[in-house]
C-alpha cells in the first residue's frame, strides 16, 4: 500500500496493533476490522460509511472514535438500509443521542432494490482509502465474526477507488432519505424484530468484553436509548414533567437512573419498600456512588443526594415541610408506578415539590379506577411502548392465550360501585367442584414448570393451593399478612418456585406490579376480568424473557360476568374497549407470534351479552350514577364525571354528539332532576345560553381558553378585560409546560421564547378575540378601552356561586380534553 497520512502502528485499548490490508476476524485481534477502523479514524479528515444495517452493539463500539473525529471537525456521513428491519432503532437513536445532527445519517430509499453494501471510506490530506468486504456495523462483524474485508488506497488503484466513491456519493445524495426525528420515530414505531435477528443475536451477544474492552456493564440499551433521547428532547422544548409508558421488561428503573444522572438531588418515590431497595441498587450501579438514603419507616434520611422514599411516609403532611425538605430541594423526582399518582398521598408529594423535572413511570397509564393520570404530567408523554409493541420488538416473549368457557353463573352476583363483592365470589368459587375440575384439566393440558394463578381473595387462594396440592401439584398461596395452611411469604414462594419445590403460586394482589418472575411459563386468570389495567399487569408478570422460554401460556376462565369480552381487545392492544368487537376476535391484530384461541361457547356468550347491552344513553346514565355513588352521592362536575367514567363509555360520548353530556351538561342534569336551586335559576335564564356557548365553542386550537381564563380571574369574574389582563393570562397559559407548541405551526421553543408582548397580543387579537366576537352568539362584545367585554345582561349572573363553579368546571374540562385529544393524535403517529 502506498504511503498515506493514516496511522500505521499504534496501541488501541492498550493492545499493540499494526495496520493491515486484510481483515478476516476470528480469534486474531490484529485481523479485527474494528481495530483497523480505529487506526484509520485517527487522522481522517472525512469519513463515509455505507452498510446494509446498523446494530446497537456495533455503534456503541465506534461511538468514542466518532466523537473524537467530530470534535476535530471531521465530516461523517452514514448510509444504511431499512430493508427487513434489521437496522435496530436503538442503534440510530444512540447515534442521534450521542452525536446529535453532527453526523449526516440517512436510509437508502429505493424499495424495489436490494441493499447489501459494506464499505468504509476514509479521506486524508493526500489521498483516501476504502474498506470493502462483508462487515456491517455490529459487534460480531467488527470483531471475532468470520468476516472478510480488504483495504486499498486511492494511490494504488485510483480508477476503482473513484468508481466506488462516486457510486457512494450518488446513492447518498440521490437515493436516500434523511433520518430526522420524524423519520426515526416512524421507523421505530413500525419496527418489528425480524426473525433473522434471533440468529444475529447469538453471534452479537456482548459476552466477549475482554476481547474489546469497549463495553460498560451499566449503560442504556434498546428502548432505554430511545426513551432517553425523547426525554432530553422534551426538556429542550420546555417540559418540566413527563410520563414514560413502557411495558414490563425495558428496565424503567434503570432508565430513570440514567436520565437523572446529571441532576444533583434526586427523589425516587414508590409504594413498596422492596421496590425502593431494588431501585437503590440500580441507581448505585449507574451513579457509582454511596451517596443515597431511604425515607420510610424509622429511616428519615434528608442529607443524601438521592433519596428513596415510600409514598406512605413522605406523603404525610408533617414531612412535606421546610423542616425536612423545601419545595425546591430536589432537582429531579421519579414517581414509580405512576398510575397511582392520582391517589391523595401521591398528589400531596407532586403538588408540594417543584423540581426541574418530574418523571412518571408506568406500564399501564390508562386511568386506574377511572382516574386520569395524563393530566398530572401535562399530557406530556415523551416515550411510550405498549405491551403489543414490546412483544413485536422482541423485548417480551409472545403469549398463547386460551379463553376457556366457565359455566359458573355470575348473573345473581351483586355489584358494588361497578365491581363484584369478594364475599359473593368466595361463595361462588369455594367448594365449586366442577370449577376445580375445569381448572385442573386445562392446567394439566398445558402443564407448566412454573405457574401463577390470580385469585379473588385470601380464602380463594388458600382453597386453590389446597386443591392443587391434594391433586399432586405442589402449590402455595401468597397474600398479605398470610397465616393460612398453604400460605407462604412471597420471596420464599418465588425461591421455591424457581427451585421447582412447588409448581404453582396462587396469589391475591401481590404480583400485580413491581415483582416479576421471568421463569414463569403460565399464568391463570381465576377471577372476573374487571379492569384492563389489572389484566395487563397480571399478563405482564409472565412475559419477561428467560433462557429456553419461547412463549407464555395464558389460561383465562371466562363466565357470564360483566366485561367478559374485554380480553381479546386488551390482547390486541385495542385502545377503544368496545366489547361488541369481542365476537370478532379473529379479525383483531395480535402481537407477532402470539396465538389467541376462544372456546366456541364463549363466542356464543359474547353474542348473548352483546344483545343485552344497553343503549348509548342508558350506558351514560348508568355510568353517571356509578360515579355519583363513588362520590358519596354527590353530583359530579364535568371533570369528575370524565375522571371516573370508564374509557369505553367516554369514547361513546365523543363519537355521539347528540348523547354527549359534556356538550350540554346542565341539560343532562336537568333531565335527571339533579340541578340545585341556584343552578335551576341559571338554567331557566340567560346563564344557560352563555354556558352552552363555552361548552360548545369550536376548539380546533386552544387559543380561546386563556381569553376565557382572563375573564374568570380565579373566580372574581370580570365583565371586561384589558389588553394587559389578556396578555398576562395568555402568556401564563402558553408558558406552562409544552403548551407553547399550540401557539403556531412549525415554531421552535427558542423562537417562542423570543416572541415579544406585541407579537403575543397581536396573535390574541387576530385569532380568539376576533372569533369570540364573531361566534359567541353576541355574548362577547367590543368596548372602548378594553380588549373584550361581556354583554351587559350577564352582569346579574357572574356573581352567582353556581355560575362561577360552572365556568371553572367548563374551562378545566375543555382544556384537559383538548390536550388529551392532542396526545392521542400524537400517539398514533
Where are these regions (language model features)?
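A short beta-strand element within the Helicase C-terminal
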Residues: 132, 504-529, 534-537, 541, ...
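Conserved helicase ATPase core of P-loop NTP-dependent helicases/translocases
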Residues: 277, 294-295, 299-302, 319-321, ...
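Walker A/P-loop
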Residues: 236-259
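Long, largely alpha-helical accessory region at the distal end of helicase-like NTP-driven motors
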Residues: 187-220, 425, 435-441, 445, ...
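Conserved segment of the helicase C-terminal RecA-like domain
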Residues: 532, 541-575
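Post-DEXD/H (motif II) to motif III coupling segment of the RecA-like Helicase ATP-binding lobe
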Residues: 340-401
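Conserved interdomain linker/interface between the two RecA-like ATPase lobes of SF2 helicase motors
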Residues: 381-452
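PLD/PLD-like phosphodiesterase catalytic module centered on the HKD motif
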Residues: 1-221, 225
Amino acid at each position: 500500500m502506498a504511503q498515506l497520512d493514516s496511522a500505521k502502528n499504534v496501541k488501541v485499548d492498550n493492545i499493540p496493533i499494526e495496520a493491515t490490508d486484510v481483515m478476516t476476524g476470528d480469534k486474531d485481534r490484529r485481523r479485527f476490522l474494528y481495530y483497523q477502523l480505529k487506526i484509520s479514524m485517527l487522522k481522517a479528515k472525512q469519513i463515509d460509511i455505507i452498510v446494509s444495517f446498523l446494530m446497537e452493539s456495533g455503534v456503541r463500539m465506534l461511538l468514542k472514535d466518532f466523537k473524537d473525529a467530530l470534535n476535530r471537525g471531521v465530516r461523517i456521513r452514514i448510509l444504511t438500509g431499512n430493508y427487513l428491519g434489521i437496522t435496530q432503532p436503538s442503534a440510530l437513536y444512540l447515534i442521534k443521542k450521542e452525536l446529535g445532527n453532527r453526523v449526516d445519517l440517512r436510509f437508502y430509499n429505493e424499495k424495489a432494490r436490494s441493499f447489501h453494501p459494506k464499505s468504509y471510506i476514509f479521506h486524508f490530506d493526500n489521498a483516501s482509502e476504502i474498506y470493502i468486504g462483508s462487515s456491517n456495523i455490529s459487534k460480531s462483524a467488527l470483531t471475532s465474526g468470520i468476516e472478510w474485508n480488504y483495504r486499498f488506497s486511492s494511490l494504488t488503484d485510483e480508477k476503482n477507488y473513484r468508481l466506488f466513491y462516486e457510486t457512494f456519493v450518488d446513492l447518498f445524495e440521490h437515493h436516500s432519505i434523511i433520518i430526522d426525528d420524524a423519520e426515526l420515530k416512524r421507523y421505530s414505531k413500525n419496527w418489528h424484530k425480524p426473525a433473522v435477528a434471533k440468529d444475529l443475536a447469538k453471534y452479537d451477544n456482548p459476552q466477549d468484553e475482554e476481547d474489546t474492552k469497549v463495553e460498560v456493564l451499566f449503560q442504556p440499551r434498546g428502548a432505554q436509548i430511545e426513551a432517553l433521547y425523547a426525554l432530553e428532547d422534551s426538556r429542550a422544548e420546555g417540559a418540566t414533567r413527563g410520563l414514560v409508558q413502557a411495558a414490563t421488561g425495558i428496565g424503567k428503573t434503570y432508565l430513570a437512573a440514567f436520565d437523572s444522572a446529571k441532576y444533583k438531588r434526586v427523589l425516587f418515590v414508590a409504594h413498596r419498600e422492596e421496590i425502593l431497595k431494588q431501585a437503590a441498587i440500580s441507581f448505585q450501579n449507574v451513579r457509582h456512588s454511596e451517596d443515597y438514603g431511604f425515607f420510610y419507616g424509622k429511616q428519615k434520611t434528608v442529607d443524601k443526594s438521592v433519596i428513596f422514599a415510600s409514598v406512605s411516609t413522605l406523603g404525610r403532611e408533617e414531612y412535606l415541610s421546610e423542616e425536612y425538605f423545601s419545595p425546591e430541594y430536589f432537582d429531579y423526582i421519579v414517581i414509580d408506578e405512576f398510575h397511582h399518582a392520582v391517589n391523595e398521598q401521591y398528589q400531596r408529594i407532586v403538588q408540594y415539590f417543584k423540581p426541574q423535572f418530574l418523571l412518571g413511570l408506568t406500564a399501564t397509564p390508562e386511568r386506574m379506577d377511572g382516574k386520569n393520570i395524563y393530566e398530572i404530567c401535562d399530557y406530556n408523554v415523551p416515550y411510550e411502548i405498549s405491551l403489543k409493541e414490546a412483544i413485536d420488538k422482541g423485548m417480551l416473549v409472545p403469549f398463547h392465550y386460551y379463553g376457556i368457557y366457565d359455566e359458573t353463573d355470575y348473573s345473581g352476583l351483586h355489584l358494588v360501585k361497578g365491581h363484584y363483592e369478594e364475599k359473593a365470589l368466595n361463595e361462588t368459587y369455594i367448594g365449586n367442584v366442577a370449577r376445580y375440575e375445569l381448572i385442573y384439566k386445562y392446567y394439566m393440558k398445558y402443564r407448566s414448570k412454573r405457574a401463577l394463578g390470580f385469585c379473588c381473595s385470601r380464602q380463594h387462594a388458600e382453597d386453590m393451593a389446597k386443591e392443587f396440592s391434594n391433586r399432586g401439584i405442589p402449590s402455595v398461596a401468597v397474600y398479605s399478612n398470610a397465616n393460612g395452611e398453604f400460605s407462604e411469604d412471597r420471596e420464599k414462594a418465588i425461591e421455591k418456585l424457581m427451585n421447582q419445590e412447588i409448581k404453582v403460586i396462587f396469589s391475591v394482589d401481590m404480583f400485580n406490579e413491581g415483582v416479576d418472575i421471568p421463569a414463569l411459563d403460565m399464568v391463570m386468570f381465576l377471577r372476573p376480568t374487571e379492569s384492563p389495567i389489572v389484566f395487563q399487569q397480571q399478563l405482564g408478570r409472565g412475559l419477561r424473557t428467560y433462557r429456553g422460554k419461547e412463549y407464555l401460556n395464558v389460561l383465562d376462565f371466562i363466565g357470564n360476568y360483566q366485561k367478559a369480552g374485554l380480553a381479546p381487545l386488551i390482547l390486541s392492544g385495542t385502545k377503544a374497549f368496545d366489547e361488541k368487537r369481542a365476537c370478532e376476535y379473529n379479525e383483531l391484530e395480535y402481537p407477532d407470534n402470539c396465538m389467541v384461541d376462544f372456546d366456541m361457547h364463549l363466542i356464543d356468550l359474547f353474542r348473548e351479552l352483546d344483545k343485552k347491552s344497553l343503549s348509548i344513553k342508558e350506558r351514560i346514565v348508568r355510568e353517571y350514577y356509578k360515579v355519583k355513588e363513588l362520590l358519596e352521592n354527590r353530583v359530579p362536575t364535568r371533570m369528575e364525571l370524565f375522571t371516573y367514567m370508564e374509557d369505553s363509555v367516554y369514547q361513546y360520548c365523543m363519537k355521539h354528539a347528540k348523547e354527549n353530556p359534556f356538550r350540554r351538561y346542565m341539560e343532562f342534569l336537568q333531565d335527571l332532576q339533579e340541578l340545585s336551586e341556584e343552578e335551576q335559576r341559571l338554567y331557566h335564564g340567560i346563564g344557560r345560553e352563555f354556558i352552552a356557548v363555552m361548552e360548545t365553542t369550536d376548539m380546533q386550537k386552544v387559543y380561546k381558553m386563556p381569553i376565557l381564563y382572563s375573564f374568570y380571574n380565579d373566580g372574581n369574574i370580570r365583565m371586561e378585560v384589558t389588553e394587559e389582563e389578556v396578555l398576562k393570562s395568555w402568556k401564563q397559559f402558553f408558558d406552562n409546560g409544552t403548551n407553547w407548541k399550540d401557539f403556531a405551526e412549525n415554531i421552535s421553543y427558542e423562537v417562542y421564547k423570543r416572541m415579544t408582548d406585541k407579537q403575543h397580543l397581536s396573535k390574541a387579537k387576530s385569532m380568539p378575540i376576533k372569533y369570540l366576537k364573531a361566534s359567541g352568539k353576541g355574548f362577547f362584545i367590543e368596548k372602548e378601552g378594553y380588549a373584550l367585554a361581556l354583554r351587559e345582561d350577564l352582569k346579574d349572573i357572574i356573581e352567582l356561586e353556581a355560575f362561577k363553579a360552572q365556568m371553572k368546571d367548563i374551562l378545566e374540562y375543555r382544556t384537559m380534553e383538548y390536550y388529551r385529544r392532542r396526545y392521542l393524535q400524537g400517539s398514533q403517529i
